From Swiss-Prot:
GO terms for cellular component: plasma membrane. Pfam families: XK-related. The lineage of its organism: Eukaryota, Metazoa, Chordata, Craniata, Vertebrata. It comes from Rattus norvegicus (Rat). Its main location: membrane. Belongs to the XK family. It is a multi-pass membrane protein. This is XK-related protein 2. The chain crosses the membrane at residues 34-54, 67-87, 97-117, 173-193, 203-223, 268-288, 305-325, 356-376, 381-401. The gene is Xkrx.
Length: 448
């Protein structure tokens, strides 16, 4: 992951204990925006491979497969264009070229060129002071102590940072509203057709990379949103742990969904739709039960209709993420930030418990009712491998939150404390039940 600007690991001043005092940090350094190039590459690669498969399906008169492949591509592409326009606020600006590129679904390409031009401009002017700067304050943990650091951020660096943030949100939209259904459907087609042409393999590869990248960004954005006052860094070990966790979680979940759908075919549709609708309406049910008012300050130029459209879009994205993996945050529609900034161990535990039960049920359905989908491969072995892969992903998730989270020292309770609390409650309940049963004979004897 790239950082558009960063500050050194340790400020070149003596740390102080009081947060009321401010350490003046050095001028930020800008780095090459690799993530913008990578997101654009994923978008173009998935779009090109999807259109190629649409052409192949049309040539082979496979209208049903062609329709779904094209629909998933178009929906995610349109949502990507709207996301970039919304983040950059282009509707209030006179930028006909950018709007035209978005109209022909090439908005990420022109935005990537703009970001590269901005980077080259900064590179040529390196060492020169910008006339327009703003002050940014963030907390940092240095030797276990919170230190408030202030530094100047130039207008050009802030513009490049806005491009980076826009592409992060674009990658999430593409991953969970386009790549997840595309990957699931292409896996299903491969399963029932018993062949893997090169074009479909390339499309599934791009979709899998996009989903894994989007899920990894979910964790990073969740940490940034929950700890907005802190300057956060994720090292290579932390990013590797998140990537392994998300890859195992998503691949095992999607494979189980595909095998379940291939087993029951149309009978699986009501279960999957009901599952998605429960996730979709859960935040709205909590919002209505709380009796809170709809937030009217998400964007200062938004009407109530515009705010409602944003809330619905965010809810659809939230449901799409939670359908395939954990969203790393809990949606809270009554809040201006739209997320619950608490740690929410209970929400995380509930999600993985429910998903584990669902996966086991779907795997059992495939094992006992499924047809022979893969030659020379045991259904029992396949079912065990998928469940083990999902359990390993949960293990990497617990490892990250227990030992690798960048701000784990701020947790009031960690994973071990939560598990210990559950075990203590269960042990205490068993002791109470045993004491009650042991007292019953003594009571009866005293009565006699």
């Amino acid at each position: 992951m790239d950082r558009v600007y960063e500050i050194p690991e340790e400020p070149n001043v003596v740390p102080i204990a009081s947060l009321e005092d401010v350490i003046r940090g050095p001028n930020p350094r800008f780095t090459f925006p690799f993530s913008i190039l990578f997101s654009t590459f994923l978008y173009c690669g998935e779009a090109a491979s999807a259109l190629y498969m649409v052409r192949i399906y049309r040539k082979n008169n496979e209208t049903f497969w062609m329709t779904y492949t094209f629909s998933f591509f178009m929906f995610s592409s349109i949502m990507v264009q709207l996301t970039l326009i919304f983040v950059h606020r282009d509707l209030a600006k006179d930028r006909p070229l950018s709007l035209f590129m978005h109209l022909i679904l090439l908005g990420p390409v022109i935005r990537c060129l703009e970001a590269m031009i901005k980077y080259l401009t900064l590179w040529k002017k390196e060492g020169q002071e910008e006339p327009y700067v703003s002050l940014t304050r963030k907390k940092m943990l240095i030797d276990g102590q919170e230190v408030l650091i202030e530094w100047e951020v130039g207008h050009s660096i802030r513009t490049l940072a806005m491009h980076r943030n826009a592409y992060k949100r674009m990658s999430q939209i593409q991953a969970f509203l386009g790549s997840v259904p595309q990957l699931t459907y292409q896996l299903y087609v491969t399963l029932i057709s018993a062949e893997v042409p090169l074009g479909r393999a390339v499309l599934m590869f791009f979709s899998l990379i996009s989903v894994t990248y989007g899920a990894t960004l979910c964790n990073m954005l969740a940490i940034q949103i929950k700890y907005d006052d802190y300057k956060i860094r994720l090292g290579p070990v932390e990013v590797l742990c998140i990537t392994i966790w998300r890859t195992l979680e998503i691949t095992s979940r999607l494979m189980i969904l595909v095998l379940f759908s291939a087993t029951l075919k149309l009978k699986a549709v009501p279960f999957l739709v009901l599952n998605f609708l429960i996730i979709l309406f859960e935040p709205w049910v909590k919002f209505w039960r709380s009796g809170a008012q709809m937030p009217n300050n998400i964007e200062k130029n938004f009407s109530r209709v515009g705010t409602l459209v944003v809330l619905i879009s965010v809810t659809i994205l939230y449901a799409g993420i939670n359908f395939s993996c954990w969203s790393a945050m809990q949606l809270k529609l009554a809040d201006r930030d739209l997320v619950d900034k608490g740690q929410n161990w209970g929400h995380m535990g509930l999600h993985y418990s429910v998903r584990l039960v669902e996966n086991v049920i779907m795997v059992l359905v495939f094992k006992y009712f499924g047809v022979k989908v893969l030659l020379n491969y045991s259904h029992s072995l396949m079912a065990i491998q998928l469940i083990i892969a999902y359990l390993i992903s949960i293990g990497f998730m617990l490892l990250f939150f227990q030992y690798l989270h960048p701000l784990r020292s701020l947790f009031t309770h960690n994973v071990v404390d939560y598990l210990h609390c559950i075990c203590c409650r269960r042990h205490h309940r068993e002791r109470v039940e045993n004491s009650e049963t042991s007292c019953e004979p003594d009571t009866r004897q005293s009565i006699v």
